[in-house]
A protein has these predicted regions:
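Solvent-exposed, acidic/flexible segments
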Residues: 55-59, 80, 105, 130, ...
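Short hydrophobic/aromatic-enriched beta-strand-loop microsegments
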Residues: 48, 94-101, 225-230
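Acidic/histidine-rich helix-loop elements
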Residues: 45-59, 157-181
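Structured beta-strand-rich core segments of catalytic domains in phosphoester-bond hydrolases
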Residues: 16, 21-33, 55, 64-67, ...
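Metal-dependent phosphoester-hydrolase catalytic domains
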Residues: 1-33, 193-202, 208-284
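Short, solvent-exposed loop/turn segments at secondary-structure junctions
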Residues: 50-51, 81, 115-117, 153-156, ...
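Active-site beta-strand/loop signature of hydrolases that rely on acidic residues for catalysis
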Residues: 41-48, 62-85, 137, 148-151, ...
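Membrane-proximal juxtamembrane linkers immediately C-terminal to transmembrane helices
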Residues: 34-40
């Protein structure tokens, strides 16, 4: 009888610890929101891994997914406009307004919008020789405007196979992760300044290459932003898949003035990342 009591206490303790860490680090979301509720603003972010282009069939499939989602505003990471002409020509029919940033010769980020954008451009980040950039645009929604900031934060530069090799050879991928995290934190710091200066509700989205409760995410969320998946998703919601690694590193963060109506991660094998889609109500 005593041993059963001890086992029960241990199991309850483990459960409470697991619940605490899940709450603290926002790992597995549990929410009642579900389905596709009507929204005034629907946004989508996706790292399409097209920095060096893609074959025509893959480009058409990528465009088809985006068009079928019918978001009002789309951000694509690792996108080269010069070599993704098929995607661009198909999207331009529905999304006539664009804002592009090409961080270096083969890689960039782009906004596609149904609505005209104002105050578009780049957030000033005082660093040279680095492909660190946050793009921005303001769009009119209902009786208000929303400031959208698109980020693609520094990668850790390893995939599942490389990580396994480093682990086996006793070199530490953690050091590589922390080095890249410093760059992400730097970008988050200057993006935070843009958030605080905004006169409108803000959405920050993109491939952030980091997890909830990491320093870069904490910096952004210290402005009062909420994570759409944690607030409205269900389950782990992995957005990155490579070999055995399943990570949630693509995020849509939003101001408390916006009301989250829906959020989902769409499974696809067209990229190493899955697109994240969220719908919001803007009217007060």
């Amino acid at each position: 009888m005593k041993s059963r009591y001890i086992i029960t206490i241990i199991c309850l303790s483990v459960l409470l610890v697991a619940i605490y860490f899940n709450w603290k680090y926002e790992v597995v979301a549990i929410n009642l929101i579900g389905g596709e509720e009507d929204s005034e603003l629907k946004v989508m972010t996706w790292n399409v891994h097209c920095s060096e282009g893609a074959d025509i069939i893959r480009q058409r499939k990528i465009a088809e997914i985006i068009l079928n989602e019918d978001a009002d505003f789309v951000q694509l990471n690792e996108y080269n406009l010069d070599s993704c002409t098929v995607i661009d020509s198909l999207l331009k029919i529905k999304y006539p307004f664009t804002e592009e940033y090409q961080s270096h010769q083969i890689c960039g980020d782009i906004f596609y919008s149904k609505r005209q954008m104002t105050n578009s451009g780049h957030v000033w980040i005082p660093i040279q020789g680095k492909s660190i950039q946050t793009i921005k645009a303001t769009i009119r929604v209902a009786s208000d405007s929303v400031q959208i900031l698109g980020v693609h934060m520094a990668s850790n530069h390893y995939d599942g196979i490389a990580f396994e090799k480093e682990f086996q050879s006793d070199t530490t991928s953690y050091e590589k992760y922390k080095y890249a995290q410093e760059s992400r934190s730097f970008q988050a710091h200057w993006t935070k300044k843009a958030i605080l200066e905004s006169k409108h509700p803000v959405i920050v989205m993109g491939d952030m290459n980091d997890f909830n409760s990491s320093p870069p995410l904490d910096t952004l969320m210290s402005c009062g932003l909420k994570d759409s998946w944690w607030e409205g998703g269900n389950g782990y919601g992995s957005t990155y898949h490579d070999c055995w690694m399943l990570l949630r590193i693509d995020h849509i963060l939003y101001s408390k003035e916006l009301k989250l109506k829906s959020v989902k991660v769409k499974d696809t094998d067209l990229s190493g990342h899955n697109p994240v889609v969220a719908g919001f109500s803007v009217s007060k």
